[in-house]
């Protein structure tokens, strides 16, 4: 299917860390299945940029985020976005935490160290966040964070003191 399509980017979201699959995702989907899809897309079309996204604030640990990014990168994914999960309604999963912007900046750095060609990491980032700028970065342009973004990829934020996460209590 991908062989004949004039795509530049194939995007498929892993959504959450593997441990939370059964809580967050539809039972027909999984982190492992998403990895296979992303790997397969890259095998069929090595020229195709691949992108995925992770939501945070669902109960994962910082270490699990780093591990998930490493797993995604290992299958050849080129671009990644990380953003805060926001509970759409009371019927949806509650928010577990709101990581401080400094933690998003740390994840941005980890993703770059892992070799992602483009990264957007921040509380307001969504899976298609500034897709054009992310594409330009992946093609060798300026990192998204140097474009004057507000609240998006926040690796430019330097926080005095230690980074913390605010735990959220839901009624």
Q: Which ranges hold each PLM region?
A:
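Auxiliary Fe-S-binding modules of radical SAM enzymes
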Residues: 4-6, 29-49, 54-171
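Structural/interface elements that position substrates and couple domains in central-metabolism enzymes
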Residues: 6-11, 19
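Glycine/Thr-rich beta-alpha phosphate-binding loop at enzyme active sites
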Residues: 19-32
């Amino acid at each position: 299917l991908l062989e004949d399509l004039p795509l530049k980017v194939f995007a498929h979201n892993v959504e959450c860390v593997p441990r939370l699959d059964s809580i967050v995702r539809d039972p027909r989907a999984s982190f492992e299945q998403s990895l296979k899809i992303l790997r397969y897309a890259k095998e069929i079309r090595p020229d195709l940029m691949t992108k995925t996204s992770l939501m945070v604030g669902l109960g994962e640990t910082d270490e699990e985020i780093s591990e998930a990014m490493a797993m995604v990168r290992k299958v050849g994914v080129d671009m990644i976005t990380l953003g805060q999960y926001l509970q759409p309604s009371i019927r949806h999963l509650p928010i577990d935490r709101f990581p401080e912007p400094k933690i998003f900046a740390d994840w941005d750095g980890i993703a770059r160290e892992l070799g992602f060609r483009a990264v957007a990491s921040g509380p307001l980032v969504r899976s298609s966040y500034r897709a054009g700028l992310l594409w330009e970065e992946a093609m060798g342009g300026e990192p998204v964070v140097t474009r004057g973004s507000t609240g998006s990829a926040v690796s430019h934020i330097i926080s005095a003191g230690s980074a913390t996460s605010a735990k959220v209590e839901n009624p």
